Design a protein with these regions (language model features):
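N-terminal capping/small domains of soluble enzymes
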Residues: 1-236
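Glycine/Thr-rich beta-alpha phosphate-binding loop at enzyme active sites
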Residues: 25-38, 251-348
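Histidine (H) residue identity feature
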Residues: 31, 196, 219, 240, ...
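Short, well-ordered coil/turn segments that N-cap beta-strands
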Residues: 51-55, 76-78, 237-241, 297-301, ...
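Active-site-proximal loop/turn and secondary-structure-junction residues that shape catalytic pockets
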Residues: 61-63, 86, 245-251, 307-311
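Conserved beta-strand positions in the central sheet of alpha/beta enzyme cores
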Residues: 81, 242-244, 304
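Contiguous hydrophobic segments
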Residues: 123-144, 241, 253-257, 305, ...
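Extended, H/D-rich, highly charged conserved domains that either
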Residues: 221-238, 242-255, 274-281
Length: 350
């Protein structure tokens, strides 16, 4: 298996999708019988838009490539949090391989996108078009029932850099970007290959790809920096904002006891993260201030639960001294933090 991500041109991907659908009644190996269609008539509302399901793929390497986003959509995902991008990218951010270990609970040692920011952007726009096409062509929905959420990190200086600013602005409105024009042209030139997707449907695709953004910060990021970045997204970029929170907010004793109770006594925590990461009272105070600001701006603030949990590498599972835990062992911590925050805000927090 290659250790590099290979990008598929939009026209080639479209040809692949249409030919596989015709020949095998499947797309990327997913049979038509498995394609999800909301038959209940119930929807989740977020930012004034409707989602057929409140589910989405975990934001990781899987949500870097357009074809994986398509696969997630076909199987029922409708809230697509795109893989985090940052100023330091591509070959400038070397990743030790293997970088993911998932025998039971999951671990990784990779940081952000392995693609250059412009390449990641192109993948997300290709996916945006492809989902609109399949939504109509397959009869999965008459109107858009999915949403993209961009994710960026990891400090305000990097986020304000020209590269990152171009990315954010391009997600806010993609109409004048090269990849947007390319995808439109490809679909126009192939419009006669569709049975249900029309030129009118193409013209209806909104260039506002992401009305919301998720802030990802490194473990140990000062609370003042987190709040400065969130303020920037709300005030300057006019974006609904999610702040990614760490499971360390629960405190070391709770995390240790919970992992032990689930049979994960062999997981060794790094105690210093519980000291230097954002503390729960500070998080609550910050979120209350951000909610007040968002309300003034007619925007919304929320949290993403949770970031990974740093643990020690003791058995050479992956290269290095520390790895980041996710998977089912993290789920109980995420749900516990969600419950704690929900009680603190009386349920009034996305």
């Amino acid at each position: 298996m290659s250790d590099r991500m290979r990008l598929i041109p939009f026209e080639k991907m479209l040809s692949w999708v249409l030919s596989e659908l015709k020949e095998k009644d499947s797309i990327f190996g997913i049979h038509r019988s498995k394609f999800y269609k909301n038959k209940s008539g119930s929807y989740t509302e977020l930012f004034g838009e409707k989602l057929a399901t409140p589910l989405g793929p975990a934001a990781g390497p899987n949500s870097q490539l357009a074809q994986n986003i398509v696969a997630a959509y076909l199987t029922g995902c409708r809230f697509i949090e795109l893989k985090t991008v940052q100023k330091l990218d591509g070959e400038d951010l070397p990743v030790s391989k293997p970088c993911i270990y998932a025998q039971d609970e999951c671990y990784n040692v990779e940081w952000s996108t392995e693609l250059r920011v412009p390449d990641a952007y192109n993948e997300y726009i290709k996916a945006w078009f492809m989902l609109h096409v399949l939504m109509k062509e397959l009869g999965l929905s008459e109107k858009r029932d999915f949403m993209f959420n961009m994710s960026v990190g990891y400090d305000l200086e990097g986020i304000k850099s020209p590269k990152m600013d171009a990315y954010i602005e391009g997600m806010r409105n993609a109409a004048n970007t090269d990849i947007w024009k390319e995808c439109r042209e490809v679909l126009l030139s192939n419009i006669n290959q569709f049975t249900h997707f029309t030129r009118e449907d193409l013209d209806m695709i909104s260039p506002v790809v992401c009305p919301s953004i998720t802030l990802s910060t490194l473990h140990g990021c000062p609370p003042q920096e987190i709040e400065r970045i969130a303020n920037y997204f709300l005030k300057e970029k006019k974006l609904h904002t999610f702040v990614k929170m760490n499971p360390t907010l629960l405190g070391e004793k709770f995390v240790r006891d919970t992992l032990d109770a689930m049979g994960y006594g062999y997981i060794t925590l790094n105690g210093h993260h519980f000291i230097h990461d954002l503390q729960f009272p500070d998080a609550v105070a910050m979120l209350k201030r951000l909610k007040a600001l968002a309300r003034e701006l007619n925007l919304e603030i929320g949290v993403k639960l949770t970031n990974t949990l740093p643990v020690k590498i003791l058995n050479q599972e992956l290269p290095g001294e520390e790895m980041y835990m996710s998977g089912r062992s993290l789920y109980a911590l995420s749900i516990s933090l969600a419950s704690k925050l929900a009680k603190e805000f009386n349920g009034d927090l996305h």
